[in-house]
Amino acid sequence: MKIHYLLFAFLLVLLSPLAGVFSKTINNPVSCCMIGGICRYLCKGNILQNGSCGVTSLNCCKRK
């Protein structure tokens, strides 16, 4: 039974760096541009807000 706990702990430590790979966090202008968005203060009309551009007042906006 101890080997199961050891294996679980090993897998947890081994796979923990991959957690950031699956989430699409947009928090800088480069990642905003990579998804086809632009940094604006307001997202109006048929444009959706996908995240922020690093500064709290700028939003990453992308068309629907």
UniProtKB/Swiss-Prot annotation:
Cysteine pairings via disulfide bonds: C32-C60, C39-C53, C43-C61
Pfam families assigned: Defensin_beta
Presence of keyword Signal: yes
Keyword Iron-sulfur: no
Signal peptide extent: 1-23
GO CC annotation terms, alphabetical: extracellular region
A Gene Ontology biological process term: defense response to bacterium
Subcellular location(s) of the protein: Secreted
Main location per the UniProt record: secreted
Keywords recorded for this protein, A-Z: Antibiotic, Antimicrobial, Defensin, Disulfide bond, Secreted, Signal
Family: Belongs to the beta-defensin family.
Function of the molecule: Has antibacterial activity.
Name of protein: Beta-defensin 5
Gene: Defb5
